[in-house]
């Protein structure tokens, strides 16, 4: 076939595009994905995962971290292997071979061609910086074209150990490298896009050889052909800059970024440079999105060598789910300032995380992050940091802005899942064998003169000075453990464990006192760690924070010790089966505004035909908002062009009304609609609360969620209790502990709109004719700015003149019935005990049937009444739901129809239970106090006992009567409180 002579170098299954390399003409071909090519791509990904070492060379491995794998919780790679990356492998999941640590010496023979280019002629001496920089330049800047040509020829002829031809025939030479025994490698959630390690080098080589990146599409194929070498010519101004610069022109790759990438937006900035979102294009064909970091270097070669430390650290790391994946780097001119000159900049191409960073997410949530999310994030960070430590790298700047949130599609669960990724390796350092094996005298000769990282996340030993004013400690793995503990504390409580740190989410907080903060951190001790009372966190979470924030470094655990604990093993197993998913919100102010929607979930849905193939009008219509006071709360009705803030639309349907198997009374089934669908959005104006909203069309099966409030009262009561919302739990069982997740995802809860109005739940149904003019109000966040909050259904409350607690409104299905049964069963047992206690004063006596059986029957009658009432209510409710569905209207629970039947049933149950309780008390009083004891108690020996003292006839029955009276009061309280 024609494709046999091509080498597959890139495959993006989401975009259904592939890039092939022609070794004869040294050109690149862009083609649509086919079934055969897609199958070959999967084989290449599989081959790449088997042969690639998941840790760097043994010389860079940290000696303090054991290299033996740790089996976590008995998790095997065959049980949901691709669902969550926290599965730790003790055996290769593909070739079924056990790990052999003795084969680690063969890793150097099986590394990729990219690393061969970068590390060609490299020296084993880690202190020889010049040799390392030259080796990096050999790989990155291609100053040695002969070496690159030879390496490319090896790739074409099959010399690369990690390549396979288009027919799937392996061209691997030598012995396949064993699966790396690192316990920190985690299998990917879904099949990642295949990108050859030589792809960007081949692209760069083809660019230098004169590839013309024009639109030459023929039969859905886009071929880059050789052209004249006009593209390599540089303007005279840039030639003068090259001559005056400290960098030779051969180090610069002029026009590479503009030719193959299209810059969209700026997504972040830091001390080293800025990060931009870009799209990789060949002949106008979109091949995916990446993040590129531009670091100005100018003529400062020492600064370039320092920045290259990040590149060196990234290139030694292979693909890991919790680490930002490095792609390529090169030198090129750029203009960092708007009115400044063009200077040489180092471009670092990396993987793009599509859901912002942890700092923005924590600023939105504050201290409301559920513990299930905290533990999932913590496990992700442990695996990422553990992989860095195992690879001989310490990050030295673990903080929320450097932790990115990424969402990927999980083909196993058919939904998106969320995980964290560690980024920004500009301050990282390597842990070489010379540093660990060097004698103490050698270590003392290397003195630390400053600090690297953020003060709030620095370990105390790094700020402690000796008598001579010099720092005592150096950076090691335990510094990252401390930063992880501070990060875990901040996720749990929304603040830092320091007095002078101020608000971590405010850049220039006046309460932040830097000199006092440094002294506080340097003098930190174990007994100074204080946990706030609100929010309440579990003891396990507090214990983990306490262990991580030990003042002495040797008392802190290693990552391998943390992951080997039984508690973390159980958590890892849980999140392997049930990975979390965060709603995709607009918390990232640098959100991608491109018309191309290439997220994995969108592509999968597009293939299924459940959504439209284009959604460019959504982002274009979001710019038509006319006032900044419009809130982000939205409701879904019909298509419109007035989209506000491009937020998620929410709808509520009654198609499944009355089909709840858990006997919930008129449960309203909530559903979620993709934001891609065109929906009409109601504009909420926080300044004018007297605007009127259009009436709800009774012929539609949708309820417009509207936030109501009283103009004279700013109190708004919202039900945030997941345990009291059965409709929400039935729709999303995987996020039952995530209250804020459900609030943002569009599930209906409920609202109180008046000072004297009672609360109605999400299972309540509002009559369309009960209210025509409703006032609206925007719920603002804790910072005072209008945030993205949920629109709640408007329900008109009855004028009862009595305000009840929001969570106690109606009796609901199985849960209420179970509570009644448990209570009355305990009451019956207590009644039996009272009868035996009544007869305990006489020896060899027991309660007579005239005393015991009637009381036991009266105690069990309420159970039968409750079950009968629930069954009748459910039958009437189902009939009423059928009438509602046939008419296409929704009736209020407190109005006519099923709501009235339920309320009448509750009132009847209350009356019956009250009457039965009073009858039981009177009967016990008559039998035990007014009648002789010989009637209420019966002797086992049939011998008339000797009469006891008068105290047993008077005092003891009165005590028993008091106990029964207490039981009556508890019963009445339960009846009126529950009903």
UniProtKB/Swiss-Prot annotation:
GO molecular function terms attached to this record: ATP binding; protein serine kinase activity; protein serine/threonine kinase activity
Membrane topology: Multi-pass membrane protein
Compositionally biased residues, Polar residues: 593-602
Reaction(s) catalysed (UniProt annotation): L-seryl-[protein] + ATP = O-phospho-L-seryl-[protein] + ADP + H(+); L-threonyl-[protein] + ATP = O-phospho-L-threonyl-[protein] + ADP + H(+)
Segments of skewed composition (Low complexity): 212-244, 610-666, 728-737, 753-773
Annotated ATP binding sites: 267-275, 293
Region (Disordered): 207-245, 593-666, 713-793
Superkingdom field: Eukaryota
Transmembrane segments: 846-866, 912-932, 956-976
Stated name of the protein: Probable serine/threonine-protein kinase iksA
Species per Swiss-Prot/TrEMBL record: Dictyostelium discoideum (Social amoeba)
UniProt lineage: Eukaryota, Amoebozoa, Evosea, Eumycetozoa, Dictyostelia
Encoding gene (name): iksA
